[in-house]
Amino acid sequence: MGIFITPLWSEYIVSADQGGIFMDHFNVYSDIQARTGGEIYIGVVGPVRTGKSTFIKRFMELLVLPGLEDVHARERARDELPQSSAGKTIMTTEPKFIPKEAAKLSLGDGVEVRVRLIDCVGFMVEGAAGHIENEKERMVRTPWYEEEIPFTAAAELGTRKVITDHSTIGLVVTADGSFGELKRENYVPAEEKTVQELKKLGVMEWN
């Protein structure tokens, strides 16, 4: 799994040996809080069937839901969690903001942010299922075109929009083939495509 910071932050997260100013994790969070007014959008991207929705669900369950004091807000946010399952079938069909209303998250030392995660379909992987129907690729409607377009094209377009238009932080979810029914090598082309899309924006990798 890799974390990428969009161009707004990249110049500040360069190590000294790269000619930049080193910042620890706390200072990064504090700086992002100040520059965004405390509202952070985490775009969870990568190939299909890597566990992006599962990551979002666990992130919400562990870090966000426990901090929601209003029981009704907590239940609404729980109802908005994405579905996840094992197997080859693609579960996510379009980009989705989770939760619908940004939730407060404390990062410690007085740093509080409002967080929304963005789920997306991801780039297609050989062997994945759910995009073919009657031996033809499914045609789907999107907010971006009046006519129907192929599922794969819609998935790529939505994923690129999450990367380029909506995310403060891009989080790439990868798979090593140790879970699920797809082999590691099936994921590699889609992983490379995801990282290349991020690098086009001039983002910096943060390990």
Where are these regions (language model features)?
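Conserved G1/Walker A P-loop phosphate-binding module
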Residues: G19-E147
